[in-house]
Structures are given as structure tokens and as C-alpha cells.
Curated annotation (Swiss-Prot):
Entry function: Specifically methylates the guanine in position 1207 of 16S rRNA in the 30S particle.
Keywords: Cytoplasm, Methyltransferase, rRNA processing, S-adenosyl-L-methionine, Transferase
UniProt KW Methyltransferase keyword: yes
Protein name, entry field: Ribosomal RNA small subunit methyltransferase C
Domain of life: Bacteria
UniProt subunit comment: Monomer.
PANTHER family in the cross-refs: RIBOSOMAL RNA SMALL SUBUNIT METHYLTRANSFERASE C
InterPro entries (UniProt xref): DNA_methylase_N6_adenine_CS, Mtase_sm_N, rRNA_ssu_MeTfrase_C, RsmC/RlmG, SAM-dependent_MTases_sf, Small_mtfrase_dom
Originating species: Salmonella paratyphi A (strain AKU_12601)
Gene Ontology MF terms in the entry: 16S rRNA (guanine(1207)-N(2))-methyltransferase activity; nucleic acid binding
Amino acid sequence: MSAFTPASEVLLRHSDDFEQSRILFAGDLQDDLPARFECAASRAYTQQFHHWQALSRQMGDNVRFSLVAQASDVADCDTLIYYWPKNKPEAQFQLMNILSLMSVGSDVFVVGENRSGVRSAEPMLADYAPLNKVDSARRCGLYHGRLEKQPQFSLESWWAEYNIDGLTIKTLPGVFSRDGLDVGSQLLLSTLTPHTKGKVLDVGCGAGVLSAALASHSPKVRLTLCDVSAPAVEASRATLAANGLEGEVFASNVFSEVKGRFDMIISNPPFHDGMQTSLDAAQTLIRGAVRHLNSGGELRIVANAFLPYPKILDETFGFHEVIAQTGRFKVYRTVMTRQAKK
């Protein structure tokens, strides 16, 4: 994190107004403004492990990563600055959670890019903190209101589920493919053969659908699942439990918290981080896989056909093959051999 996002640049136009504020930063925290903003006190709360990693280097215990905010995250804060994400249900989940903890009378600021749908904040918060638009610049909107009524928030009411091939998939707002199995994952699933054995790592596990489907027809696999998203980690745990499956699930920025080597790594890697296109996670996945695959171990990923993954696969492993494809997606497979660049 270094350069400020357009949303942060809009906030900086009003920096003098915040000098006496005790601020909680939350939402899509794509830069380190929470650590550098001049104010009376600054805290940050995030559901994204990689955002917590970056901010904790400067903010220490004043930034926290978890599924839901707690009273301690809001302690003494009189102002919320919320960065609007591209996912509206995710925004609603987070705002209802945070505002249920903040004191009536607190200042509420919502900032985000117009293309992210930040305008939806006005009707969403109309009953709790009626918003007015106070600035428009850098293709972003900045809204302000005061908390008039705390919303009710119960985590249980936000869970959803769907069924696929006899499996129950548990989901939460902010989890990839929350409303059903996406086409890319479906294509990757079609390539997983029954009676797979060994240790399997599912990177960017989402709701845990890939691992659950694999384990349902390959009961001897030993599953490890990870994701940067706190809702995804909790959803994957719930999916495994709902189907009587076992596996280790934890938060990790690709391989940052992963220990050991595996016989197979599977992934439907993201190529967006918030509103921005980013291949960083997928490149880290491919290049880092050589340090986490056993000899003869396999990396199998699905991706949009236009993304430049074949080049990275060949540079890292020496070869790749396409084992399934549609007009939009391809499933790539490569194997850990002596020619892989460790």
C-alpha cells in the first residue's frame, strides 16, 4: 500500500474537518490512508486478510481482521469512514454490523467510486443515518450523515445456502458466487476425478464448494482451504461441517500462512481486488506453488481464457496443458518436475 486510491484522495480534500475526530475506517481499504490520516485517533476494521496485513505494519493492534466487528473495534470512535465495496450485500452486512455498535450521533461518511454503486448507500442507510452528498470528484462520491438509530444485527440472519449434487453450500455476503456455483468453478469441478488421494490445498476457497465436491467422491483426500476473506473462511468451515467433511480452513494471503507441501493445489483465483483488476494473487499462486507442491504434485486452476496465465505457468513450471475449456474459461494443469523454478 502506498499510492492513494481516488476515494482516499476525495477524503483528503476534507482532511481539515477530521482533525478532532476519532475515526473507525472500514470497508474496502485499498491503501494506507487509515494509518496516515491526521485525526485525534484512528482504528481500522476489515474482513480482508491482506488489507489487515498491510495496515497492521503501521497501525499494530489498532487494526483488526474478523468476520464481524466488535464493540472494542468501535471503542471511543465518534466517526465512521466507510469505503464502499463493489458488492452491495457485503456493504449492507458490514454497515449494519458496524452501525449497530456505534453511538447514536456518530458521524457517518461513505466514500466510493461511482461505478461501484456507492449511490446505493443513500437508500440503504435512509432509516439509520440519512446521507447527503458532500463532494464529487475523481469519479467518486462522498456522503455524510449522522447516526439517528442503531440497526439490529444478528449474524445468523445473514447466512444463506444452496445445493449442488447433494451437497449443501453455506454462504455469506461478500463470498464469491454467493448465489450459486459459478461457471468457472463448474468447469474445474468437471475435471476432478473420483478416488483422488493425498493432501489437497484449495487456495481462494470461497464457500468451499471445490473442496466439498472433491471430498464427496474422494474420501481419502486431506483438505486444506484458505482465503483472504473472513466471510469465505467461515463459509467454508460451515460448508464442510454441513456435509460431514473434515479439513483445515484459515485466512491466508495466497500462501502467506500456508505451511508444508501438497499433492495437489486447486484454485479459481481472483483477478479483481475491489474495483481494480489485479493479477497479483494469481501470479503469486503460480510462482509460489513450486514451494508448496510435492514432487509430481499438480497445480490445477481455472481462469478466464483471456488472462495471460499460460506464459506464467510455462516460465515457472516449464510447461502447461489445457484440460478443459469453454468459450470463456480454461482449466490449466501443470506438474511439479525437476524443471520447475524453485
